[in-house]
Design a protein with these regions (language model features):
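Bacterial N-terminal signal peptides that target proteins for export
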Residues: 1-6
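Flexible, glycine-rich phosphate/dinucleotide-binding loops
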Residues: 14, 111, 192
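A generic alpha-helix preference that emphasizes hydrophobic side chains
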Residues: 14-15, 99, 180, 258
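Acidic/His/Gly-enriched intrinsically disordered linker/tail segments
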Residues: 45, 122-138, 153, 173-322
Length: 322
């Protein structure tokens, strides 16, 4: 699920320090580029919709989209299972269906009618095992007031929801800060057309957050939802928290979640190893088993480390209830 705001207003402290002799659990990718896949496009449907079929997905577009753009979007869509399957973390936990449906809804009315939540722009429907995307937002996302660039499709929105689809059988076993944060992590790493960049993550995340939470900047500081509040949210509470942010910036919880995932994956080999082991462990558990707690740390400690780390990288943060 991804909520985005729809209106835009006019000495280093090392988080990543590794102990001497520590090595990564597995080699971390520096980049990833999706392999070409076979596509079938049907633009002769009775209801006027466009249908694209690929090895993992069947995408239906309610609005007219050029074949070249459809081909590119399908390449982005297919890149996600390729990436998640090959990633060193045990994230892939595929849907029961071999083909996942994606519906590009023409507007919010169609999106909500199909089962999406009002105010959201992307939605993973776990019951029907399909992805819903608001095409009006996806194809022309809001731009900052002083931007002279033509709006480009928000391919990161596709990546976010399809990460959920790729992890669907594990979502209920993981806290929402991790499932939403990891989806945003891959979304930020996606550079377009199924190409992902995992090096220079500090710059990618910093620049992304400067845009995404620009309206929450006071002076030189960006105001975020506190770490203790985010770590304590249930999946149902997450939806409420996203919908209730002052000023309508539903992205704020995602911003903190993104920083938390970066902390657990790039905050040293020990944190990454614990995260990796936990992800592997939960895949083998029966629904009857009690779910083990996610291996994290004291929230106040993490929050202090985040403030210090990102301040040395050009992102001044204040964690405060809005």
């Amino acid at each position: 699920v991804l909520y985005r705001f729809l209106i835009l207003l006019i000495f280093p402290v090392s988080l990543l320090a590794q102990r001497p002799g520590e090595t990564p659990v597995e080699a971390w990718p520096r980049s990833f580029k999706a392999k070409p896949v076979d596509l079938r496009i049907n633009d002769k449907t009775e209801d006027g919709s466009l249908v694209v079929e690929s090895p993992h997905f069947r995408m239906v577009a309610e609005t007219r989209i050029g074949r070249q753009d459809l081909t590119r979007f399908a390449r982005v869509v297919e890149s996600v299972p390729q990436l998640i399957k090959s990633h060193p973390l045990r994230l892939w936990n595929s849907p029961r269906k071999s083909i996942t449906n994606i519906l590009l809804c023409k507007d919010e009315t169609s999106f909500v009618k199909a089962g999406g939540d009002e105010g959201a722009v992307g939605w993973w429907d776990g019951h029907k095992e399909r992805v819903l995307i608001r095409s009006d937002y996806f194809l022309a996302p809001p731009q900052t007031e002083n931007s002279r660039l033509q709006a480009q499709p928000d391919e990161g929105l596709l990546v976010h929801e399809l990460v959920h689809a790729s992890m669907s059988a594990s979502l209920w076993r993981l806290p929402p800060w991790f499932t939403e944060g990891i989806a945003e992590y891959f979304s930020v790493c996606h550079q377009g057309g199924g190409w992902y960049l995992f090096r220079d993550l500090d710059s990618l995340i910093r620049n992304h957050l400067r845009r995404a939470i620009s309206r929450n900047k006071v002076g030189e500081h960006f105001h975020l939802v506190p770490v203790p509040s985010i770590l304590a949210l249930s999946h149902q509470d997450w939806i409420k928290a996203s919908q209730s942010q002052p000023g309508g910036n539903a992205y704020l919880p995602y911003a903190t979640a993104l920083l938390l995932v970066h902390y657990h994956l790039h905050g040293g080999a020990e944190r990454r190893a614990k995260t990796s082991a936990h992800l592997a462990k939960i895949q083998g558990l029966s629904p009857r088993n009690k779910m083990p707690a996610f291996p994290t740390e004291e929230p106040g400690f993490i929050q202090k480390r985040l403030v210090n780390y990102w301040s040395s990288r050009g992102l001044q943060l204040i964690f405060r209830e809005q």
